[in-house]
Amino acid sequence: MMLLKRCNRRALVALAAVLLLAACGGARELPDLSDVGDGVATETLWTASTGSGSASSAYALVPAVEGGRVYAADSNGRVTAWDAESGERLWRVDTGRELAAGPGAGGGLVLVGARDGRLLALDAENGEERWVSGLSSEILAVPQIARNIVVARSGDGRVYGLDGLTGRRLWIHDRSVPVLTLRGSSSPVVVGNRVVVGQDNGRLVTLNLQDGEVIWEAPVSIPRGRSDLERMVDLHADPLVFRGVAYAQAYQGELAAVGMGDGRERWSRDIPGHTGMAADSRQLYVVDDQSRLWALDRNNGATVWRQDRLQGLRLTAPVVIGGHLVLADEEGYLNWIAPDNGDLVGRDRHGRQPIQRPPVPDGDVLYLLSADGRLAALRLVED
C-alpha cells in the first residue's frame, strides 16, 4: 500500500486517499503462477537477523555492501555489520532511535537516518558514533557519501551536503513540495561531482556535490488534474544514471531519459510508477504502476518486451545480476526474468514475509532483506 503525506493542510483528504488505496489493494487478485518452476539456481551462503525489521513500507532500510562487509539496520535502532563472505557478525550497536533509512556506507562511515530527523554517522570498523546531525524532518531516503561529503535528503524535500568528518552542514538545496505527496523519498544518486535528485514536483535536478548549486533541472512529468491527488507526480523511484544518461520515473506521470551533460530530454514514455529501474548494455528495465515489467531500448525508449504475469504482486525494482534479471515481491519470492525476451523463467521463495526493497547485488551474490529483518546472502549457481 502506498502511503501519502500532506503538508500545511488538513490531513483528512490524505487519510481518505490512503483508505481508498488500501481498499483497492485489499481487492487485488494475485496471479496464478503455479506452473512456474524454480528457475535460476541459488545457494544460501548464510542468513542472519537484523533485529525487528522494518516498521513501515515507506522506510528505506536496505543492506549496504562495502569493503567486504554487509551493513543493515532495523526500525528499532539497531545497526549491524557482518562479514560478507562468512556471515560472521562483527558488531552491533543500538542507536536508541527509530531508524527509517539506510545504511549508506563509504569513506569509513555507516550512515543511517531516523524518524526524528537525525542523521547518524557510525565508524564502519566498530560501530562507534562519529557524529550526529539534525535535519529538518524525518529521513526516508538512503544517505550517500562521496569525496568525503555526505548527501542526505529529508522528508520535506530538502537535500543536504555535510562534511564527512564532522557532520557540519556545507550546503542545502531547498525546494517547495506539493501539498500532497507520497510518503517516502527517492534517494539521491552521486555520480562523480554531481548529485542527481528526483523531486516531489516531478522535476529531476542535478547539483554540484561541493556547493549544492544547481547544474541543471529538467521536467520529467507535469501535474495534471484538478485535485491534489490527481496532480501527484512524485519522482518516488530512485533515479538511475547509466552511461551518461539519467532515467527518472514519476508516480502518475512519465518515464524520461535525460542527458547528464546538458539536462535535455532524450525520450519520454507514458509509463508511470514508483518502484525503480535497472539497466544493462542494451535495455532499460522498469516496473509500472500495475506491476508490469517493461524492457525498453535505452537509446530511444521503444518497447522491446513487456511481462504481465506478475500483475497484482507488489514488486521491488528489478536487479541485473550475472546475465539475469530478478525482482522480489510481497510474498517473499524472487522472480527471475529472461532479459532477452521477458519470459518468467523461475520463482523461488525465501520466507513468507514481504520483501519491500530490491535485492542488493555484489558480484555473483545477492543480499536479500525481508520485512521481518531476515537477511540472506544468496550465490548464483551456474550450470
Curated annotation (Swiss-Prot):
Alphabetical keyword list: Cell outer membrane, Lipoprotein, Membrane, Palmitate, Signal
Lipid attachment in record (N-palmitoyl cysteine): 24
Any one biological process term the GO annotation gives: protein insertion into membrane
Annotated GO CC locations: cell outer membrane
Subcellular location: Cell outer membrane
InterPro entries documented for this protein: BamB (IPR017687), PQQ_b-propeller_rpt (IPR018391), PQQ_rpt_dom (IPR002372), Quinoprotein_ADH-like_sf (IPR011047), WD40/YVTN_repeat-like_dom_sf (IPR015943)
Keyword Signal applies: yes
Lipidation (S-diacylglycerol cysteine): 24
Superkingdom, taxonomy of origin: Bacteria
Membrane topology field: Lipid-anchor
Main location: membrane
Parts of the chain that traverse the membrane: none
Keyword Chloroplast in record: no
Pfam families reported in the protein's UniProt record: PQQ_2
HAMAP family: OM_assembly_BamB
Family to which this protein belongs: Belongs to the BamB family.
Subunit details: Part of the Bam complex.
Function noted in UniProt: Part of the outer membrane protein assembly complex, which is involved in assembly and insertion of beta-barrel proteins into the outer membrane.
Protein name: Outer membrane protein assembly factor BamB
Organism: Alkalilimnicola ehrlichii (strain ATCC BAA-1101 / DSM 17681 / MLHE-1)
